[in-house]
UniProtKB/Swiss-Prot annotation:
Annotated localization: Mitochondrion inner membrane
Gene name as annotated: mt:ATPase6
Assembly notes: F-type ATPases have 2 components, CF(1) - the catalytic core - and CF(0) - the membrane proton channel. CF(1) has five subunits: alpha(3), beta(3), gamma(1), delta(1), epsilon(1). CF(0) has three main subunits: a, b and c.
Sorted UniProt keywords: ATP synthesis, CF(0), Hydrogen ion transport, Ion transport, Membrane, Mitochondrion, Mitochondrion inner membrane, Transmembrane, Transmembrane helix, Transport
GO MF annotations in UniProt: proton-transporting ATP synthase activity, rotational mechanism
Family indicated by similarity: Belongs to the ATPase A chain family.
UniProt name for this protein: ATP synthase subunit a
């Protein structure tokens, strides 16, 4: 019986009082075989096609005013988040994307850099974004307040969306995993096993979707300041 359901997210692996769980964020660089870097294979060809597709889509979202090479940042962001989401599905591996410490670290600097660049280099454009076209004069102050609040909470919504989706799926899998050992019926155990497999497939889809949503929204926020 678990004393705390959220204990699965605790960064508790330590050596000499130093937390090692956050190293799981970069564990992919250690476990990827060197052959992936030296010669093309099926995995690398598929992955390159995925990255090329994302590059084209992000380039379209950024528009003609987007800076050259800016899509590399968003494609890398997608790869980092998706890889860590998938790592969290493996047993005994720390899920770094289920913590606001990581998600806010990714979202807030991006949003802040976009805002600083926009307000310094494109001040009139940023002021124009505060009032949608066709807004009646009486509603302009109200719309400015709404747009300002929506801009300020953007990094928080980005971070919380990713964290909440990762936590929700892991909690369901943890609950089912703790229910199985207490059951003596083979029928119930079979149903729990099938449900666990279905949840694992669902979580795999969520891992891809949430990393894609995070990268796409970051790209859209960047396109607004150009």
């Amino acid at each position: 019986m678990m004393t705390n359901l959220f204990s699965v997210f605790d960064p508790s692996t330590t050596i000499f009082n130093m937390s090692l769980n956050w190293f799981s964020t970069f564990i992919g660089l250690l476990i990827i075989p060197s052959t992936f870097w030296l010669m093309p294979n099926r995995f690398q060809i598929i992955w390159n096609n995925i990255l090329l597709t994302l590059h084209k889509e992000f380039k379209t979202l950024l528009g003609p005013n987007g800076h050259n090479g800016s899509t590399l940042m968003f494609v890398s962001l997608f790869s980092l988040i998706m890889f860590n989401n998938f790592l969290g599905l493996f047993p005994y591996i720390f899920t770094s994307t289920s913590h606001l410490t990581l998600t806010l670290t990714l979202a807030f600097p991006l949003w802040l850099s976009f805002m600083l660049y926009g307000w310094i280099c494109h001040t009139q454009h940023m002021f124009a974004h505060l009032v949608p076209q066709g807004t009646p004069p009486m509603l302009m102050p109200f719309m400015v307040c709404i747009k300002t609040i929506s801009n300020v909470i953007r990094p928080g919504t980005l971070a919380v969306r990713l964290t909440a989706n990762m936590i929700a799926g892991h909690l369901l899998m943890t609950l089912l995993g703790n229910t199985g050992p207490m059951s003596t019926s083979y029928i119930i155990l079979s149903m729990i096993l099938i449900t666990q497999i279905a949840l694992l497939v669902l979580e795999s889809a969520v891992a891809i979707i949430q990393s894609y949503v995070f990268a796409v929204l970051s790209t859209l926020y960047s396109s607004e300041v150009n």
